[in-house]
Regions:
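Short, polar/acidic, helix-capping and beta-turn segments at strand->helix junctions
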Residues: 2-130
Length: 130
């Protein structure tokens, strides 16, 4: 895969994400992943624990296509609470670095009123290019 981080001249440095990514190769689309395990049981009601599980689920789906976390070029996070997200940033960052590494794709975080699964606090979609 060839990949280029897009950063307009004069813009402040993006922290923890890229403003854009240009990539060539096989595309892999990962549906929204939530904080439940392979048996569709929630691992925790803790926000950071649900993020960690959702990220682990993304890594597992990517592996089915022969992709790795470094192939991720875009992520969209849907969170049910801005406050819980912000309060958990240190733990989220640690889980992200452990599971995804220091790959910072184009990324959006959207606060939503709720998710389909009532216990879900976060849902993360990913696109990868191999």
């Amino acid at each position: 895969m060839s990949r280029e981080i897009l950063h307009p001249p004069g813009w402040a440095r993006a922290r923890g994400y890229a403003n854009g990514v240009a990539a060539e190769g096989r595309q892999v689309y990962v549906a929204g992943q939530i904080g439940w395990d392979a048996e569709q049981r929630f691992v925790s009601d803790d926000f950071a624990a649900q993020v960690r599980q959702a990220l682990a689920n993304i890594v597992a789906v990517l592996a089915c296509a022969g992709a790795k976390p470094e192939h991720i070029v875009r992520m969209t996070w849907y969170v049910t609470s801005r406050d819980e997200y912000n309060a958990s940033l240190a733990e989220i960052g640690a889980a992200y670095r452990e599971l995804i590494g220091r790959n910072y794709p184009a990324m959006s975080v959207v606060v939503v009123a709720g998710l389909l699964e009532p216990r879900a606090k976060v849902e993360i979609e990913a696109t990868a290019v191999i």
